[in-house]
């Protein structure tokens, strides 16, 4: 979204993606709030790879010994002007990157940003594949365990007690089943 916005503003934008394609390194799905993306790409839901419209809300409060859940469903959730959707990030991110490319973003896939180029305390570019690329603006999007943010002191290294390993399985069900 940031690359697309900057390209539309007339800036030269290079997006560096570590994976084979944007989204290939994502292993999760998520919830996409339509009001934000609608501003960026009007009528996005007609073409974006969304899974389902969110029509129910559930909040669970969990303790070591149990859980208490609240569920809310309403016609209002089904008829919102800007509904929210479930998405698989690997599909959605690729679609959004394609939109950015259409707007003029130069996308380089299969490259890892090895380090940030810093001069006089300011980030002035990135090193990737042995080459240096100068930049007026660098936006880090390398995930929760950002080694680049650690390099410049923006965040501390995560401690083992602060992370967990998750397992995900995608089960495809037809609309008639859900």
Model-derived features with residue positions:
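Conserved Rossmann-like nucleotide-cofactor binding loop
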Residues: 1-2, 21, 145
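Surface-exposed charge patches
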Residues: 4, 35, 94, 98
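N-terminal FAD cofactor-binding segment of flavoenzymes
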Residues: 5, 9-11, 18-65
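Catalytic cores of large soluble enzymes that bind and process phosphate-bearing ligands
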Residues: 25, 29, 84, 88, ...
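Helix-loop-beta segment of a Rossmann-like dinucleotide-binding subdomain
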Residues: 67-89, 125
